[in-house]
């Protein structure tokens, strides 16, 4: 389990990445977390490369997926203080910037994947 705190609209919000998060996300939103993270990261990267703002807006579906992922990870980190409804959680913020929050979430997942890979390599050595 990995945790990271991010300041959002003047409030510190903790996010948690663990093996349970993809399952929680799938159960709550009926979507694949990793596929959605890749799609969102691609949209943000694409927008950053384009100069024409009109043709480079991030699709609303991607923004919604991002909010859903952030919500699941925040609720997983702090179930006592994160409301059971995503709309109630989002209402707490005046702004919720994908450019501020997404890098922290991606970093958590990259760190989580590295930890799993190292554990798998160590298991292979022990079993081998």
Task: Pin down the residues of each PLM region.
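Charged interaction scaffolds used for protein-protein
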Residues: 1-12, 32-64, 76-128
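Short capping micro-motif at the N-terminus of alpha-helices
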Residues: 15-17
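Short, surface-exposed, low-complexity cationic segments
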Residues: 19-39
